[in-house]
Amino acid sequence: MYRGCLAIPYMRWSPWRHWTVAAIRYRRIDGGTPKYLSMPGEKDRLYNTYALTKYSKDMAICEGELDTITAELCGLPTVGLSGAQKWKPYFRELFLGYRNVNILADGDDAGMEFARSVAKTLPNARIIPMPEGEDVNSLVTSQGKAALLERI
């Protein structure tokens, strides 16, 4: 079932075990559908919560694990959600201490809807839209790291 998929681990901190895998999502890389697979019964979680443990004045939020990884590789502390409808009100408290929470919105209607739904719950939110038809990963892949950082 998961053969030919990229395994994306969701990590969790435990004082007894340190960082451990809490869940795994799978990204199909063979072009099949559905594009993403989750283990049955999985809960909505933030991806890359390690970013929340490092000192930073700003934090970014992405829709999608691959966009989150790309933003992190560009030097932006970033957490991600597995989809546009996955923001939960209880996530809010984790982001209130930052100067800015940059919501890196995909360049489509769903991306802007995601960004607005998150932004309305955070007083320190800034929506950073990607160009039409682009997401963080495609922007950096086609135009380089500077293209993303200039938008911030």
Swiss-Prot record:
The coiled-coil segments of this chain are none
Fetch the InterPro entries from UniProt.
TOPRIM_DnaG/twinkle, TOPRIM_dom
Under PROSITE patterns, the record lists: TOPRIM (PS50880)
**What would be one Pfam family of this protein?**
Toprim_2
Residue span, Toprim domain = 57-137
Q: Which domain of life is it from?
A: Viruses
Instruction: Please give the SUPFAM superfamilies that the UniProt record associates with this protein.
Output: DNA primase core
What is the recorded name of this protein? Gene 57 protein
Taxonomic lineage: Viruses, Duplodnaviria, Heunggongvirae, Uroviricota, Caudoviricetes
